[in-house]
Curated annotation (Swiss-Prot):
This protein is one of the two subunits of integration host factor, a specific DNA-binding protein that functions in genetic recombination as well as in transcriptional and translational control. It comes from Rhodospirillum rubrum (strain ATCC 11170 / ATH 1.1.1 / DSM 467 / LMG 4362 / NCIMB 8255 / S1). HAMAP family: IHF_alpha. The keyword Transcription applies. This is Integration host factor subunit alpha.
Length: 105
């Protein structure tokens, strides 16, 4: 397991190398995809990417938590959280250690 982080610039470079668009076009394409995903999630929609997984926003209600140091009850306000659910194919690839191979689906 390498544990490295893939950046936006690296994704853009990968699009450039694989698709053959210019570097600027590749960066713009990636930016448009990420913006569309972000907008959909902000509106409460689910973003499903076949053979990869789905992103959704879940509403968490108000609840009572505790300060671990004092034991004092503290209200935790309602909020929205981002959830990612990987596809079965992605789960299988991760568990099989098929790092670097292409997802075909």
């Amino acid at each position: 397991m390498s544990g490295k982080t893939i950046t936006r610039a690296q994704l853009s470079e990968a699009v450039y190398q694989e698709v053959g668009l210019s570097r600027n076009e590749s960066a713009d394409l990636l930016e448009m995809v990420l913006n569309e995903m972000s907008e959909a999630l902000v509106e409460g929609d689910t973003v499903k990417i076949s053979s990869f997984g789905s992103f959704s926003v879940r509403e968490k209600g108000e609840r009572v938590g505790r300060n671990p140091k004092t034991g004092e009850e503290v209200p935790i306000l309602p909020r929205r959280v981002l959830v990612f659910r990987p596809s079965q194919l992605l789960k299988a690839r991760i568990n099989d250690g098929a790092v670097g191979s292409q997802i075909n689906g």
